[in-house]
Amino acid sequence: MEHKYLFVAVDAALKAGEEILSIYTDPASDFEIERKADHSPLTIADRKAHVTIATILDETPFPVLSEEGKHLEYDTRRNWDVMWIVDPLDGTKEFIKRNGEFTVNIALVKAGVPIIGVIYLPVKKELYFAGQEIGAYKLSGITTLEDDATLDKLVAASVPVSYTHLRAHETRGNL
């Protein structure tokens, strides 16, 4: 299960990053800034990234809990054993400042424990991905997922980001 959904999460993060960058790099964009109930900013990039991610993740059997999505009561959410947890644009204030310090965050969580995690830094084109069975990795220079992508290809093109996973990576002959 894990590997299939890792690719779904990576694809969603990369496509959301593309949406975000199209707004971020537009010198005429005012970002259409609004304020949420807690007075934190919300931009058109937040909203578009949310729609992009939700559209992709809605094709899976798991519900999506997103910072920018509709807020469901805890009584509904507490019965979800497996769910996606998403922050489509983490670092909205940094996005507004145009300092490049923002990410797209997606996790698949089962019984409160993350089993897949993806963090994408669109400006730097850096993707961090992790899974319980595969370890944690960093992939640089990525903007799209190739049609013939496999877990082995993704891992081989990446750098392990934890010592435990570095040893597993070396054992597979990827270093």
State where each predicted segment sits:
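Conserved beta-loop-beta connector loops within the AMP-binding
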Residues: I142-V155
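Short hydrophobic/aromatic-rich beta-strand segments that constitute the beta-sheet cores
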Residues: A136-L139, S158
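N-terminal subdomain of lithium-sensitive/metallo-dependent phosphomonoesterases centered on the IMPase/IPPase/PAP
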Residues: M1-V86
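Active-site rim beta-loop-alpha module in soluble metabolic enzymes
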Residues: V159-Y163
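Conserved small/polar residues in nucleotide/adenosyl-binding loops
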Residues: T164-G173
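Residues that mark the start of a beta-strand
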Residues: M83, K153-S158
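DPxDG-like acidic metal-binding loop motif
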Residues: R77-Y137
